């Protein structure tokens, strides 16, 4: 196998806020901590195409924002497919949003950066309302 870069691993563990928990067994970690371990593993792999399936779902609000910011900074120049049920998360983080309705795929307009969008930005709230209307099946 390939050699593990322990420096990079320690930095990523620190970045996801688990430095004090690195010697614990998985059963000793909370759901949110396990979620951050999975995120750290993805960050360590450093692949050009990344699938994130509900990566922030078990996190508290502050940690969620911190991890969203971390992911956005670490995945610059990579293709990321983010699966989420959170319209705010989609609008804050994504350049393009697809809505799945059964077997139908509906693409919304492309969004422009910078990313992640500021949670206090009025544009974020307008885009989120527009996305929610589309999810409900209302005309845009």
Predicted regions and their residues:
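Conserved ABC ATPase "signature" region
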Residues: 4-21
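Conserved ABC ATPase signature
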Residues: 25-29, 33
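Hydrophobic anchor residue at the start of the ABC signature
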Residues: 39
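A short, proline-enriched helix->beta-strand linker immediately N-terminal to the Walker B motif
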Residues: 44-48
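Catalytic Walker B motif of ABC-type/P-loop ATPase nucleotide-binding domains
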Residues: 50-54
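Conserved H-loop
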Residues: 77-84
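Conserved beta-strand-loop-alpha-helix hinge in the C-terminal portion
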Residues: 102-131
